[in-house]
Amino acid sequence: MVIYHAIKGVDEAGNPDQTSGELVRLIGENCHTVVADNEIAERYSRHLKKLLSIPSLLYKTTDFLSEVIYNSSKFVVEECPAPELPPGVRVPREDEYIVRAALISHPIIVTAEDRVLKAVSRESVLALIALTPAEALELAKDT
């Protein structure tokens, strides 16, 4: 989860890396928005509650909550239910909720999960774009 990586200051392998943190900072500063459906918003909430219980991450987590999650211009929860995947589309079962949520309004999916990146790029019928945090950071810098 990119937000988890941003707050902890690590990459998907747990190595020190500020890419996700820089991306979240840019989202907070410019016109970009985090879009989620109810399921993703609930998962964010659970992860953030865990991070709030870690004293060394309290400041970064609280900052993220105030800059993004509690800011209605930066965090939008789509209320309509996520559609089913089109027939024949294959994505890893554990990541299906991410792809289905993106089918609501077609935001850019930002993920460090290689399996999600590959599935989205392989299934062109979805008409979705998935980027790594580093790719999204470059895009955020340009806009």
Describe the function of each predicted region:
Residues 25-31, 38-84:
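PIN-domain endoribonuclease scaffold, especially VapC-family toxins
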Residues 6-8, 44-48, 120-122:
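A short acidic (Asp/Glu
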Residues 103, 108, 114-143:
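Acidic, PIN/NYN-like endoribonuclease modules and their adjacent C-terminal/linker elements
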Residues 2, 40, 97-98, 115-117:
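Alpha-helix capping/helix-boundary segments
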Residues 1-36:
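Short, well-structured N-terminal submotif of metal-dependent ribonuclease cores
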Residues 70-108, 119-121:
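Active-site neighborhoods of divalent-metal-dependent phosphate/nucleic-acid chemistry enzymes
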